[in-house]
């Protein structure tokens, strides 16, 4: 994990745009 505050908006937006941004956010943040 990198920053919860940074991941939260990405995770919140992920379902609207699909799994692509979710996977990118997870990879970028180390989750």
Curated annotation (Swiss-Prot):
Which keywords label this protein? Answer: Cuticle, Repeat
- Note the segments forming the sequence repeats: 7-10, 13-17
Gene Ontology terms, MF aspect: structural constituent of cuticle
Asked whether the UniProt record includes Transport among its keywords, one would answer no
Highest taxon in the source lineage: Eukaryota
Q: What's in the domain note?
A: The tetrapeptide (A-A-P-[AV]) repeats found throughout the protein are also present in many proteins constituting the protective envelope of other species.
Annotated function: Component of the cuticle of migratory locust which contains more than 100 different structural proteins.
Name the record gives this protein = Cuticle protein 54
């Amino acid at each position: 994990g990198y920053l919860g505050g940074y991941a939260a908006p990405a995770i919140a937006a992920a379902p609207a745009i699909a799994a692509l941004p979710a996977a990118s956010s997870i990879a970028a943040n180390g989750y």
